């Protein structure tokens, strides 16, 4: 990592530390402590990704080969694409569809990081980006959209390594559009965990994307307030839902 990239990462972390309350700092520090600087990708662009937060969830590199073979196993259901776009097939359940469209499975591809898995990740994301935009349904549910934004930001090093400029621009346009939609629908998001997920996604976006920097202060404040409101003194959620 070059000196300028290290400065950019440190600056972003410093901003988040200054603006966030203790609860919010804990959440973001865990994810950004091992963040990856992305400034080396197309330096100088004002719409570029600066850092990628660390994904702390468990990974299984063997699942990358299943996905490459077109087998998508989520929520106890298996769908095989047989060469078709997985996004065009009928989902076997809403939970399966939510897992697919949350893009959390990208972390398994990153665990098996290779030229093949990177190309596979880009191909699948391109499939999603190329779909006609029809807002509504599971893919545009607040909690699913928030998970997708977080996953795409976290797995940007996998997706953008070896990518050409055209894919980079498509990826960023789509990501920015989804972030904008999250901000627009914020007032309608139900209370509880979904609202918290959306605020975390928006805070990540403001810290990771150069074109979202103007939202750092408001996103950080809203996340800090929501964490203070929803988290109990013992660290549990007020719903007591594990």
Language model: regions and residue ranges:
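A near-ubiquitous, low-amplitude feature marking generic local secondary-structure context
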Residues: 3-10, 14, 88, 92, ...
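Aromatic-lined, polymer-binding surfaces characteristic
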Residues: 94-242
């Amino acid at each position: 990592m070059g000196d300028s990239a290290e400065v950019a990462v440190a600056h972003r972390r410093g901003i988040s530390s200054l603006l966030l309350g203790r609860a919010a700092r804990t959440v973001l520090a865990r994810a950004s402590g091992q963040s990856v600087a992305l400034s080396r990708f197309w330096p100088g662009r004002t719409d570029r990704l600066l850092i990628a937060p660390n994904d702390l969830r468990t990974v299984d590199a063997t699942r990358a080969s299943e996905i490459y073979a077109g087998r998508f196993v989520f929520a106890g259901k298996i769908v095989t694409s047989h060469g078709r776009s997985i996004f065009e097939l009928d989902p076997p359940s809403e939970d399966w569809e939510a897992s697919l469209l949350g893009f959390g499975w990208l972390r398994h591809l990153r665990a098996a990081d290779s030229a093949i898995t990177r190309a596979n990740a880009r191909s699948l994301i391109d499939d999603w980006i190329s779909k006609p935009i029809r807002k509504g349904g599971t893919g545009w549910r607040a909690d699913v959209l928030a998970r997708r934004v977080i996953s795409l930001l976290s797995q940007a090093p996998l997706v953008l390594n070896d990518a050409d400029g055209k894919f980079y621009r498509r990826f960023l346009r789509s990501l920015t559009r989804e972030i904008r939609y999250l901000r627009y629908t914020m007032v309608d998001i139900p209370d509880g965990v979904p609202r918290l997920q959306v605020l975390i996604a928006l805070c990540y976006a403001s810290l990771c994307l150069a074109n979202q920097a103007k939202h750092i202060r408001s996103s950080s404040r809203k996340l800090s307030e929501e964490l203070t409101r929803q988290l109990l003194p013992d660290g549990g959620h007020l719903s007591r839902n594990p």
